[in-house]
């Protein structure tokens, strides 16, 4: 067993994903999910060596109780494995401009994450709860913060500044930050290996497609543009998020249709996207089933999703100058051969030609090139954000 194990925590507002990761191989020794925090049926599910387990956490429990369960029940039952854990790595959604790389957590870092909470009000406060719970449960282990936004700090001003009065950026930090950076970092790095090219000479466009979705142009291993903005709302059509729209729609909804700003925010974040267009579901699998059955709303939602994605991919050839590959990842990107084929068919001007057999084979955790031999390359690479967090954690504590 490796002596480079890291407990990785990803705290959401009402859930906590966790895994014990081998930083050398990326393999998970333990993985699990605690969910339904604050409700009567809070539960925790986990897997050890392929064997599944489940337990109740008790009514109205939350992050601290979940971390305590991980320590006192799960890890206590695996003493040899627990003894090999070298650090606790935390996924943090928003680091603003304060954090351009992963850092060992101290009071200064905690304060910085708190100050960025206004940019990610649903996520950063939950991360802080998880950090404090982990410090209490693992007082002797170093704690490491890995930021989703850090990878995008290499973007030039022309990519991240909005065409608003510049003082809004200077005084209030209003700019494009981007998300999913840890995923884009991992898959762009893996794409260079598939292409057999040095990372610093590789130009790829990465599409992380899940209930949240974003596209990033990666030039020589660095993010040069990305679709999400100040918040995760900008960019692609997503499960329940609208992505790009005319900002005056907000004014129209408030002043002409009587919506409150809170209602508009809820509408754009939780009632739009695939769900809003289809009037059926936010789940892409349900959208594809509806499409196959001729459901009009599902068909329209699928077409808009693919069209928006194809437009973004096409536009990101501009900052790259030369395109080596398009990379699909995330739950939808890794599993939907239908969406991949539709998107690439819209991009035939860039010499993309789908190989149907390869495309259908690259699902359910399998990676590979999905285009023909004479085509511009498109590939599927399953993401592994936990591995990046584990790697960064070990690198920091062994400096």
Curated annotation (Swiss-Prot):
Cystine pairings recorded for this chain: none
Principal location: cytoplasm
Residues that bind ATP: 17, 208-212, 283-285, 331-335
Site (Transition state stabilizer): 180, 241
Catalysed reactions, semicolon-separated: acetate + ATP = acetyl phosphate + ADP
Gene3D superfamilies assigned to the protein according to its UniProt record, in alphabetical order: 3.30.420.40
Superkingdom to which the source organism belongs: Bacteria
Positions annotated to bind Mg(2+): 10, 385
Record-listed E.C. numbers: 2.7.2.1
This protein's UniProt keywords: ATP-binding, Cytoplasm, Kinase, Magnesium, Metal-binding, Nucleotide-binding, Transferase
Any one GO molecular function term: magnesium ion binding
One of the protein's GO biological processes: acetate metabolic process
Pfam families xref list: Acetate_kinase (PF00871)
CC cofactor: Mg(2+); Mn(2+)
Active site per UniProt: 148 (proton donor/acceptor)
Database matches in CDD domains: ASKHA_NBD_AcK_PK
Entry keyword annotation includes Transcription regulation: no
UniProt-annotated binding residues for substrate: 91
Gene Ontology CC annotation, any one: cytosol
Enzyme class: transferase
Family: Belongs to the acetokinase family.
Subunit and interaction comment: Homodimer.
HAMAP family, per the entry: Acetate_kinase (MF_00020)
Protein name listed in UniProt: Acetate kinase
Species for this entry: Shewanella sp. (strain MR-4)
Name of the encoding gene: ackA
């Amino acid at each position: 067993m490796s002596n480079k194990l890291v407990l990785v925590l990803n705290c959401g507002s009402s859930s906590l994903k966790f895994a014990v990761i081998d930083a050398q191989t990326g393999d998970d020794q333990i993985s699990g999910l605690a969910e339904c925090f604050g409700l009567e049926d809070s539960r925790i599910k986990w897997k050890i060596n392929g064997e599944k387990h489940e337990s109740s956490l008790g009514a109205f429990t939350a992050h601290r109780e979940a971390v305590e369960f991980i320590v006192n029940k799960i890890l206590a039952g695996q003493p040899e494995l627990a003894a090999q854990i070298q650090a606790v790595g935390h996924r943090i959604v928003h680091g603003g401009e304060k954090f351009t790389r992963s850092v060992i957590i101290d009071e200064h870092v905690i304060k910085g994450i708190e100050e960025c909470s206004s940019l990610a009000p649903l996520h950063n406060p939950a991360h802080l709860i998880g950090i404090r719970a982990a410090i209490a449960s693992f007082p002797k282990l170093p704690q490491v913060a890995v930021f989703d936004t850090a990878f995008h700090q290499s973007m030039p001003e022309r990519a991240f500044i909005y065409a608003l009065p510049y003082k809004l950026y200077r005084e209030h930090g209003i700019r494009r930050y981007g998300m999913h950076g840890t995923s884009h970092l991992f898959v762009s790095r893996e794409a260079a290996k598939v292409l057999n090219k040095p990372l610093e000479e590789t130009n790829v466009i990465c599409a992380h497609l899940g209930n949240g979705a974003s596209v990033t142009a990666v030039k020589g291993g660095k993010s040069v543009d990305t679709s999400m903005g100040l918040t995760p709302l900008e960019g692609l059509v997503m499960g329940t998020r609208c992505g790009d729209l005319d900002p005056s729609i907000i004014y129209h909804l408030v002043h002409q249709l009587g919506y409150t700003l809170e209602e508009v925010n809820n509408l754009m974040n939780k009632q739009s996207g695939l769900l809003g267009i289809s009037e059926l579901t936010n789940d892409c699998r349900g959208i594809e089933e509806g499409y196959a059955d001729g459901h009009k709303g599902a068909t329209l939602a699928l077409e808009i999703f693919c069209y928006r994605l194809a437009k973004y991919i096409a536009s990101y050839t501009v900052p790259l100058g030369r395109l080596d590959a398009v990379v699909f990842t995330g739950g939808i990107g890794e599993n939907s051969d239908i969406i991949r084929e539709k998107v690439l068919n819209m991009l035939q001007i860039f010499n993309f030609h789908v190989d149907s057999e390869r495309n259908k084979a690259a699902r359910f955790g399998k990676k590979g090139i999905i285009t023909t031999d004479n085509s511009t390359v498109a590939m599927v690479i399953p993401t592994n954000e936990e591995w990046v967090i584990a790697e960064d954690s070990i690198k920091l504590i062994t400096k």
